[in-house]
Amino acid sequence: MKLKIGCFQLALKKTDNFELIINKINNFLSKNSVDMIILSELAVGGPGAKNERFYLNNYIDKFSDIALKNNIWLIPGTFYEKLENKIFNVAPVINNSGQLVTKAYKMFPWLPYEENVEMGNQFCTFEYPGFGNIGIHICYDLWFPESSRQLSLSGSIAIVNPTLTPTKDRDIETIMVRATAAQQQLYYIDINSTGDQGNGLSIISDPCGEVIHKSADSEDIFIIEVCSDRVEEVRKEGTYKLGQPIKSFRDHPYFKNSYTMNSEYLDSLGKLKKPD
């Protein structure tokens, strides 16, 4: 199955971007048809974990209405959320019925700079009907390959990463995106902001590490297509019919108890052998 995704690298103010975002979404959907829209990290409110005005509870119903009205899945970037006096950086996933399917909690806040934010303690995936399992990273999570490995072993065939990077290490992150996609044999969708928030360079890589799209540092609203059959082909037959890292990792006895594995999915990839 092919999934058509609208990716929004927006020129954002430091904060208070809700009306701008809604106008951009409405204008885009008046001209285009997609299955899903993805925004960047903290797109609405920007950094500032103690600014309760931009907490998730103030916006979840508004974005749910947008998803329902337009019959799209929506990952509207991330928001801060307070739970039991702890603050987390959270990415909600809303389906085309306007329902909150799941929330991803940022595993690795950008410490020591992302202050007052707790570490998440659970990896997040969701099922897109007919397409398959999609994992969620939030920005700095990309820097920890263990998290990508866990998502791929859980059966994810794509990772979505809402990002807010304004710093000079952005070029390094674009390299990491390609490497992660190739190592985990999946699509990696990394959406940054620009303007007063991020410095752009959003990048999407296919399961062989090839770049599907890379933005410049200006606003860029673009559409990509990802294909579940392509991931299955690469994982079963190898990258360019060569290495099969997912199956090699699956079969290594040392790691059997180190990660939570979706055995049914991993077994469906077949034996580790040379392609016909």
Residue locations for each model-derived region?
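Extreme N-terminal starter segment of soluble prokaryotic enzymes
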Residues: M1-C7
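Short loop/turn motifs at secondary-structure junctions
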Residues: K4, N32-S33, N133, G155
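Cys-nucleophile CN-hydrolase/nitrilase-fold catalytic domain and related Cys-dependent amidase chemistry
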Residues: K13-S97, K103, P166-A182, L186-Y187
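Eukaryotic scaffold repeat domains enriched in small/polar residues
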Residues: F18-E19, D35, K69, M119-G120, ...
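Short hydrophobic-aromatic micro-motifs
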Residues: I37, G132-I138, V160-N161, I189
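CN hydrolase (nitrilase-like) catalytic-core segments centered on the catalytic cysteine
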Residues: L56-I75, W143-F222
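Active-site catalytic loop in hydrolytic enzyme cores
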Residues: K82-I157, T167-I175, E237-T239
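C-terminal beta-strand edge segments of enzyme domains
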Residues: T125, S193-D276
